[in-house]
Amino acid sequence: MGCSSSSTKTRRSDTSLRAALIIQNWYRGYKARLKARQHYALTIFQSIEYADEQGQMQLSTFFSFMLENYTHIHKEELELRNQSLESEQDMRDRWDYVDSIDVPDSYNGPRLQFPLTCTDIDLLLEAFKEQQILHAHYVLEVLFETKKVLKQMPNFTHIQTSPSKEVTICGDLHGKLDDLFLIFYKNGLPSERNPYVFNGDFVDRGKNSIEILMILCVSFLVYPNDLHLNRGNHEDFMMNLRYGFTKEILHKYKLHGKRILQILEEFYAWLPIGTIVDNEILVIHGGISETTDLNLLHRVERNKMKSVLIPPTETNRDHDTDSKHNKVGVTFNAHGRIKTNGSPTEHLTEHEWEQIIDILWSDPRGKNGCFPNTCRGGGCYFGPDVTSKILNKYQLKMLIRSHECKPEGYEICHDGKVVTIFSASNYYEEGSNRGAYIKLCSGTTPRFFQYQVTKATCFQPLRQRVDTMENSAIKILRERVISRKSDLTRAFQLQDHRKSGKLSVSQWAFCMENILGLNLPWRSLSSNLVNIDQNGNVEYMSSFQNIRIEKPVQEAHSTLVETLYRYRSDLEIIFNAIDTDHSGLISVEEFRAMWKLFSSHYNVHIDDSQVNKLANIMDLNKDGSIDFNEFLKAFYVVHRYEDLMKPDVTNLG
């Protein structure tokens, strides 16, 4: 009997162990599938983000093209607003920007006292936690005072650490004020004993960019030797037009917003472009290339880099009498080439410009070599060999950079020689990623600190968080798909030799990759985007189900509507450049002239009669003017309500 009892217990124990192993294996598989879905969603967000940045960089070639061809398209003297070509001599003095703006007694927000002290930092933090707005007078004064100090600084700040004085490196914040509050809560406020480096991209995307900028600038003015600011690719007035900071300023400072934007352009240009810690760690926003020349970058006149979208122009030194001037000091000669009013020394050389672009825009890759950053459209991809070459050349040990969202807030690559740090948590969607910062001390290994701003969604189970993130990613991907409906339909039909309305998943994926230019796992995504029949074939017109572009003018041709929707961000920037008085209005003739240039440069094939008809319809009161910004807002995507509300039964894994 004793043996029988022992045998039974053994069998039960074996059964329990097998059951535990089955559950464990199932759970591991479940977690792996969730992680795969999360990875696919992040890939969608990142691919679309980089494609938008590529479009933004392509605007630089358009602006050059526009200036070179402007007189050929439109013989009358149209006025262009080009902030980057205004000289500082044309800027009004401090009185016009700061002292002429009174702070009324009725203002209940924070009142700063210059010269600033740590009390002002505390005052500002408490006010912003209460969602108060800093008066425009103080915003302008802070920017003026910060610019004054920045102008005295070198291109690269050199700092030293010690066992009793670590330095904290923060990456992109992108207007995420709660992340900055959390960093200061966990790590302490900036001080002589607690120095910080903020590695660019303070602004854009998030809704509190001006608050972050004011906290950083005030802290910098109080501790100029202990808080260090590096320029990122979003510290650029042209980037701000697309990614939200310009709109934030104009919304919060309706009366004085334009003045703030003008000063910001100069402020950005004077930001240092890098920091070197203990003579061995290079801290820059983007990365390097095989031709990165730190000696040149130490010497370059950084304030000449107003915007990455305004590349160096061809300076014609001949005194051509047959020339045409516009409002901003640009001269077109008889051949349509650009001349600038002033000496060539007022502008960066092309080589200098490319050097700065590389350190602001480049990304590391695992593959050796250096090749164009085709995803972003600017900078390059650099491999481990390039990292070793540049670090060895300048006797450095490590490169710390930001510029890329990472799921854990940081990433180490290139045999530990390159570290990416990203400080904006929940960047794409609630729960999408952690933020992180680094603490450095001479002779020790970098220490990483992770965090995540917690809101209601962050307390949800992982499955629900992944569902939310996945649904959001698929939604923006569908919006990209519908903007190319005509092109995709033609591509599908070319593959559909039997005219069946169906393609193999491989054929469908080939069309999506080819037309949209997004490097995504289309086969894996197919179950979320299209209907697949029992034989595994894609009903390709279902790519456009449950979504449409709402068009404000019903008479407009669908191809024109798709084109306007697809390029709406680019067009908004271009037409804001024409709107010299910020009225929001442009003339019908300006619209037609600039559309010709735009369609020619972007190879957009739209019949002129459609554009002329649309221009006339847009001129609602027939006064010859178009409220173009309002018109563009009218083009938006409508998702079918039921589709957004029903629970998601498919997944990306």
From Swiss-Prot:
One of its GO terms (biological process) is protein dephosphorylation. InterPro entries: Calcineurin-like_PHP_ApaH (IPR004843), EF-hand-dom_pair (IPR011992), EF_Hand_1_Ca_BS (IPR018247), EF_hand_dom (IPR002048), IQ_motif_EF-hand-BS (IPR000048), Metallo-depent_PP-like (IPR029052), PPP_dom (IPR013235), PPP_phosphatase (IPR051134). Its EC number is 3.1.3.16. Activated by calcium. Residues 483-518, 566-601, 606-641 form the EF-hand domain. Its cofactor is Mn(2+); Mg(2+). Also found in fetal brain. PROSITE patterns: EF_HAND_1 (PS00018), EF_HAND_2 (PS50222), IQ (PS50096), SER_THR_PHOSPHATASE (PS00125). Residues 16-45 form the IQ domain. Ca(2+) 2 binds at D619, N621, D623, S625, E630. It catalyses: O-phospho-L-seryl-[protein] + H2O = L-seryl-[protein] + phosphate; O-phospho-L-threonyl-[protein] + H2O = L-threonyl-[protein] + phosphate. Binds 2 manganese ions per subunit. Mn(2+) 2 binds at D201, N233, H285, H403. Keywords: Calcium, Hydrolase, Magnesium, Manganese, Metal-binding, Protein phosphatase, Repeat. The active site is at H234. Optimum pH is 8.0. GO terms for cellular component: cytosol; nucleus. Residues 121-455 are annotated as: Catalytic. GO terms for molecular function: calcium ion binding; iron ion binding; manganese ion binding; protein serine/threonine phosphatase activity. It holds the Pfam family PPP5. May have a role in the recovery or adaptation response of photoreceptors. May have a role in development. PANTHER family: SERINE/THREONINE-PROTEIN PHOSPHATASE 5-RELATED, SERINE_THREONINE-PROTEIN PHOSPHATASE WITH EF-HANDS 1. This is Serine/threonine-protein phosphatase with EF-hands 1. The lineage of its organism: Eukaryota, Metazoa, Chordata, Craniata, Vertebrata.
